A protein has these predicted regions:
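ATP/Mg2+ or Mg2+-diphosphate-binding catalytic cores
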Residues: 255-290
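Short strand-connecting beta-turns/loops that link adjacent beta-strands
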Residues: 12-14, 66, 193-195, 249-252
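Active-site Asp-x-Gly
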Residues: 131, 143, 176-179, 184-245, ...
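Extended, well-ordered alpha-helical scaffold segments
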Residues: 98, 151-163, 240, 268-280
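ATP-binding pocket architecture of kinase catalytic cores
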Residues: 1-150
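Membrane-proximal envelope and lipid/glycan-remodeling enzymes
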Residues: 17-19, 27-29, 195, 207, ...
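Active-site acidic catalytic loop and adjacent metal/ATP-binding pocket
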Residues: 3-9, 19, 58, 107-111, ...
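Preference for well-ordered, secondary-structure-rich cores of eukaryotic proteins
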Residues: 132-133, 144-147, 171, 255, ...
Length: 290
């Protein structure tokens, strides 16, 4: 993974497992990443208990530091190939059922509700309204950027005031729902022979929030087959499109700022995300209200 280190364990009886190890305590992480290994373990267990989604089985989760200097967990191995590596080699007829099934799985994830909003593994930051939770998330990523002296297209202290006039649209979200928030093709594993989904991975960034926040709903374009599987058009209203734009802004901020924290070798992602950030601010400013 991009955050936790993952190791394949092969036993002499041919069984395979995956060991995931958290970064060391002194590793500089962004605020929203605190405690995300606990989130991954708990969300995997929750999805296994409450949905029909194929997710790995968690066999051990250890925070004692007795065997390793870091937190770790052991889960079942998911066979198959990441869909992002497979997609271009499949026909449209082969891709469509996989995308439809992804939409169906998202619907199952979002059926799981909670009493408060916020990042799954940070209950001390949870709030009773989505607007308050989202403002807190924005404040967190802006503080991360400020800590690392990362320049943004507008001054840090002007960012939230710039968005203030749009934030009321978040009040339409009243029921906290489980949001995977990282269900891109790289986290969907598929059997190359049967074209069936063998596993959904990497739910450590899960949160209790607005289902529309899933990147599948318009962050990187829209996939009609995913929407067909999901069964509801979440982007039907102007208010929803404004919420989507706010969520995009948050995502582009993370993708800009995380490059410094991750120490990426190139500036490719950062440059791309900066352009998206500029575009999104213009989109928001261009939204007309009656």
């Amino acid at each position: 993974g991009m955050y936790n280190a993952a190791y394949l364990i092969e036993l002499t009886d041919t069984r395979r497992f995956v060991l995931k190890v958290a970064p060391p305590d002194d590793f500089k992480v962004m605020r929203y990443e605190k405690n995300i290994m606990a989130a991954e373990v708990e969300v995997l267990r929750l999805l296994r208990a409450r949905t029909e989604i194929p997710v790995p089985d968690v066999f051990a989760y250890d925070t004692s530091r007795r065997w390793l200097d870091n937190d770790y967990f052991i889960m079942s191995f998911v066979p198959g190939t990441a869909f992002n590596k497979l997609r271009e080699h499949l026909s449209a007829e082969e891709r469509r059922p996989i995308d439809i099934r992804t939409g169906e799985y998202l619907r199952q994830i979002h059926a799981i509700a909670h009493s408060n909003f916020g990042y799954f593994a940070q209950p001390n930051t949870h709030t009773s309204t989505w607007r308050a939770a989202f403002i807190s998330m924005l404040e967190g990523i802006l503080a991360d950027g400020k800590d690392a002296n990362i320049p943004l297209p507008i001054a840090y202290d002007e960012f939230l005031p710039r968005l203030e006039r749009y934030l009321y649209v978040l009040d339409a979200v009243t029921q906290p729902r489980l949001v995977h928030w990282d269900l891109w093709d790289g986290n969907i594993f598929v059997d190359p022979q049967t074209k069936q989904i063998t596993g959904i991975l990497d739910c450590e960034r899960a949160l209790w929030g607005d289902p529309l926040m899933e990147a599948n709903f318009g962050a990187f374009g829209s996939n009609p087959a995913v929407l067909t599987g999901y069964g509801v058009d979440l982007l039907a209203s102007l208010s929803a499109r404004t919420r989507r734009s706010l969520y995009n802004l948050y995502l582009w901020l993370i993708m800009t700022i995380e490059c410094t924290y991750r120490q990426f070798e190139t500036k490719d992602q950062e440059n791309w995300a900066r352009n998206k950030l500029d575009e999104e601010l213009k989109i928001l400013d261009g939204i007309n209200y009656e």
